Amino acid sequence: MVTIRLRRTGKTKKPSYRLVVADSRAPRDGRFIEIVGHYNPVRQPKELNVKADRVRYWLGVGAQPSETVVRLLKQVGVLDADGKPAPVTPIEG
């Protein structure tokens, strides 16, 4: 099974994380398929960048996000309050 989860990076006592798509059997910091964002909880305000189009693609093909990633994706607006993909609004112009 493919999961979207956090991969720890950064220094000792100063963690930052990458949102990665990985096989569920791979170690936390091991091999991954694609980087779809990053999260830095140490900075104030907390920094969160997500490639929303790639996350929607992976969710569409069956990737399962971890509980923490679900919470972060709700903050960004990729998932709605129920944890389902939010509708995409077309950009006019």
From Swiss-Prot:
> Which InterPro entries does the record match to this protein?
Ribosomal_bS16 (IPR000307), Ribosomal_bS16_dom_sf (IPR023803)
The Gene Ontology biological process annotation of the record reads:
translation
Q: Mind listing the UniProt keywords for this protein, alphabetically?
A: Ribonucleoprotein, Ribosomal protein
| Molecular-function GO terms, alphabetical | structural constituent of ribosome
Query: Does the UniProt entry include the keyword Mitochondrion?
Result: no
Q: Name one GO cellular component term.
A: small ribosomal subunit
Domain of life of the organism in this record?
Bacteria
Is the Ribosomal protein keyword given for this protein?
Answer: yes
Q: Which HAMAP family does the UniProt record give?
A: Ribosomal_bS16 (MF_00385)
Q: Which NCBIfam families did the record assign?
A: S16
Recorded family membership: Belongs to the bacterial ribosomal protein bS16 family.
Entries under PANTHER family matching the protein? 30S RIBOSOMAL PROTEIN S16, SMALL RIBOSOMAL SUBUNIT PROTEIN BS16M
Protein's name according to its UniProt entry: Small ribosomal subunit protein bS16
Q: Report the source organism.
A: Roseiflexus castenholzii (strain DSM 13941 / HLO8)
Q: Which gene encodes it?
A: rpsP
